């Protein structure tokens, strides 16, 4: 029963993280992330209530680069819409913190969390605190001189989320009694790890694509406006020290590693030949198709959101496979 309670708690935390990822993606895609100009973890729990409160928040926003260069003259009703989108994202973060920390303290006092699980959840707690700070660090980059957040900070924000989700998911699987049932060679085990690493790298590149709005260029597939490799890259752009600032290069890299992951997805069931490997193959192929559809349709909200959230499903499948295999 105790294990069941812990599993339910950890499963709820995983779902909450995915919900935060979804809302965070919507926040990014609707350009709502810079609407709240302060970080008030405690006093910012409630949104503006009165007309005077809303006018005050609108006045603060009117001093930001985004307002001055992009949204000058935005109506109060439109401002409320983007403000509430960002507010919901931050509120979910607070709720997730409560859902995680309160039960963890209870289970710790009852001595139901021990050993490796306790250490792992301690890391999750630290990552959660760091993630909140990173979120504000990211937003702050778009409130000073330029009307957009640093794409590197956006990528770091996502990377921390991936780590946090992976640790929670691994802990959930463990609490559910998931154990290694498939024997694989050392090489196949390393390949499974490689697939997880390359997927995470691809997700981070996806964040860079989002941060640079690189999905809004070269909306053709498989060629990039008629070329396999764009002329900007052939001219040596990839070799410069600032290639990750170039939207063309970043989109090309995202395409390239998507192909690498896809090839790996096809190889996994051929190498391992058990049910879970086919599930992963299907999940990655679906993610690849979501990515292509998002690109060629000009990054619509519903497809881009699906593409982002499904990447976490792929990570969950890869962590699951690493949990059910063992080296022989």
Swiss-Prot record:
Membrane topology listed for this record:
Multi-pass membrane protein
**Which protein is depicted?**
Heme A synthase
Which superkingdom?
A: Bacteria
Cite the record's note on assembly: Interacts with CtaB.
Per the UniProt entry, the Enzyme Commission number(s) are 1.17.99.9
Pfam families, A to Z: COX15-CtaA
Output the Gene Ontology terms for molecular function.
Answer: metal ion binding; oxidoreductase activity, acting on NAD(P)H, heme protein as acceptor
The protein's matches in InterPro entries, at most eight in alphabetical order, are given as: COX15/CtaA_fam, HemeA_Synthase_type2
BP GO terms, sorted: heme A biosynthetic process
Q: Which reaction does it catalyse?
A: Fe(II)-heme o + 2 A + H2O = Fe(II)-heme a + 2 AH2
What the record says about family reads: Belongs to the COX15/CtaA family. Type 2 subfamily.
Question: Keyword Flavoprotein, does the record have it?
Answer: no
Where does the sequence pass through the membrane? 6-26, 88-108, 121-141, 154-174, 190-210, 252-272, 279-299, 301-321
Tell me which UniProt keywords the record has, alphabetically.
Cell membrane, Heme biosynthesis, Iron, Membrane, Metal-binding, Oxidoreductase, Transmembrane, Transmembrane helix
What subcellular compartments does it reside in? Answer: Cell membrane
Q: Which GO terms describe its cellular component?
A: plasma membrane
Q: In which pathway does it act?
A: Porphyrin-containing compound metabolism; heme A biosynthesis; heme A from heme O: step 1/1
User: What is the first-listed, main subcellular location in coarse terms?
Assistant: membrane
């Amino acid at each position: 029963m105790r294990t069941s309670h812990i599993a339910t708690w950890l499963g709820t935390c995983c779902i909450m993280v995915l919900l935060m990822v979804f809302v965070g993606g919507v926040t990014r895609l609707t350009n709502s992330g810079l609407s709240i100009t302060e970080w008030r973890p405690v006093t910012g729990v409630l949104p503006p209530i009165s007309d005077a409160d809303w006018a005050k928040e609108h006045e603060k926003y009117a001093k930001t680069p985004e307002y001055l260069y992009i949204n000058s003259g935005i109506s109060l009703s439109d401002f409320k819409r983007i403000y509430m989108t960002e507010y919901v994202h931050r509120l979910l973060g607070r709720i997730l913190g409560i859902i995680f920390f309160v039960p963890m303290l209870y289970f710790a006092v009852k001595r139901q969390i021990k050993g490796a699980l306790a250490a792992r959840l301690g890391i999750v707690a630290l990552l959660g605190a760091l993630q909140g700070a990173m979120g504000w660090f990211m937003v702050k980059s778009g409130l000073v001189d330029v009307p957009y957040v640093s794409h590197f900070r956006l990528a770091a924000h996502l990377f921390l989320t991936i780590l946090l989700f992976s640790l929670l998911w691994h802990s959930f699987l463990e609490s559910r009694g998931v154990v290694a049932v498939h024997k694989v060679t050392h090489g196949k085990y390393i390949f499974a790890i490689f697939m997880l690493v390359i997927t995470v790298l691809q997700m981070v590149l996806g964040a860079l694509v989002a941060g640079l709005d690189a999905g809004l260029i070269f909306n053709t597939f498989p060629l990039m406006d008629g070329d396999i490799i764009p002329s900007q890259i052939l001219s040596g752009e990839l070799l410069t020290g600032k290639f990750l600032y170039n939207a063309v290069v970043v989109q090309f890299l995202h395409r390239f590693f998507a192909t690498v992951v896809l090839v790996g997805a096809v190889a996994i069931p051929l190498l391992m030949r058990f049910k879970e490997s086919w599930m992963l193959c299907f999940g990655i192929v679906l993610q690849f198709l979501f990515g292509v559809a998002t690109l060629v349709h000009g990054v619509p909200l519903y497809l881009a959101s699906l593409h982002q959230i499904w990447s976490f499903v792929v990570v969950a499948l890869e962590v699951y496979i690493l949990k059910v295999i063992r080296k022989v």
